[in-house]
A protein has these predicted regions:
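Short secondary-structure boundary segments
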Residues: 60-61, 84, 111, 154-156, ...
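Hydrophobic/proline-rich hinge and linker segments of small-molecule sensing/allosteric domains
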Residues: 68-109, 175-188, 200-204
Length: 208
């Protein structure tokens, strides 16, 4: 078995599963390589629909009608990015009231914005939204430049050097779930078919 398997994923905590899944798979099939594409769930789904990506690791809420999927037992935590020397960093958590008077960067995905709107409640209509962004890395650069505070999934953020930009969890906590998905009825390569089987076995959804 050989070939390339393409995986699309966001900057979310569930990505930490991929090294273990891929490593154990490549012990059986060392001639299989992987391509990782980083984007939001909407763009990953679009690429999957076009047959350009085999598998997606998606942050919910997301419409899964056309896909087979496994919901992962990992809680994705929402946090606010800020400069490390910001007065807000002295707090253990950040509330909607705290953020209601600050310039903000929000996620680009509309269904995710709806989740955040529910969390903000009455404060949402009064927010000073500077811009929206699809990935947290560029948002962090804007935060470091003093432009705004950014609401992001903790995900990869915890791996960053926090000497310039740090984060604090929201209060009350806001969490989400993620799914591993592939398009239903898609004719996959042998390598991808075996990898999907391996994922199911690895996560205890199927027998080897």
């Amino acid at each position: 078995v050989e070939g390339k398997i393409s995986i699309g994923c966001g900057e979310i905590a569930a990505v930490q599963l991929l090294p273990k899944i891929i490593e154990s798979f490549r012990q059986k099939y060392p001639r299989v390589t992987f391509d990782i594409f980083t984007a939001t769930a909407d763009l990953v789904k679009e690429q999957m629909d076009k047959g350009l990506l085999d598998i997606g690791l998606l942050l919910e809420p997301v419409d899964m009608v056309k896909y087979e999927f496994i919901r992962l037992n990992i809680r994705e935590k929402w946090v606010v990015l800020m400069k490390s020397d910001d007065p807000l960093s002295k707090k253990e958590t950040v509330s909607a009231k705290d953020l209601s008077v600050l310039p903000l960067i929000l996620p680009r995905r509309m269904n995710v914005q709806s989740e955040l709107a529910s969390w903000f409640g009455n404060y949402y209509e009064k927010l000073d939204i500077v811009f929206t962004s699809n990935l947290s890395t560029n948002s962090a650069i804007m935060v470091n430049g003093g432009l705004a505070y950014s609401l992001v999934i903790e995900g990869a953020v915890s791996f960053w050097n926090q000497s310039k930009v740090t984060f604090r969890p929201l209060d009350p906590p806001l969490t989400a779930t993620s799914v591993l998905a592939w398009k239903r009825g898609q004719p996959f390569s042998l390598a991808t078919t075996k990898f999907i089987k391996h994922i199911k076995c690895f996560l205890g959804m199927d027998k080897p």
